Amino acid sequence: MDLAFELRKAIETGKVVIGSNETMRLARTGEAKLIIMAKNAPKEVKDDINYYAGLSSIPVYEFEGTSVELGTLLGKPFVIALMAIVEPGESKILSLAGGK
């Protein structure tokens, strides 16, 4: 699977939330279907997101690149440490975590 292609497709056809605060809120409420986290996200953020995602049974995918690389991959001029897939749209992004 081409990660960049599927992420862009999810952004265009589905509902994707970018940012630590909003992603954390979705993890707490169980509204996200997949959380994507940059490998260099701060440790406390990683710990919190893994805890809340675990409580809500939301899969967490650790992106192999940095937050700068994740931002660039999405065509954004800023860093992205956390993002949540709420609706995948026409993408197959949920297959990252064995989703449907």
Swiss-Prot record:
It holds the Pfam family Ribosomal_L7Ae. Belongs to the eukaryotic ribosomal protein eL30 family. The keyword Transit peptide does not apply. PANTHER family: RIBOSOMAL PROTEIN L30 (PTHR11449). One of its GO terms (cellular component) is cytosolic large ribosomal subunit. One of its GO terms (molecular function) is structural constituent of ribosome. The keyword Calcium does not apply. GO terms for biological process: translation. This is Large ribosomal subunit protein eL30. Keywords: Ribonucleoprotein, Ribosomal protein. InterPro entries: Ribosomal_eL30, Ribosomal_eL30-like, Ribosomal_eL30-like_sf, Ribosomal_eL30_CS, Ribosomal_eL8/eL30/eS12/Gad45. Signal peptide: none annotated.
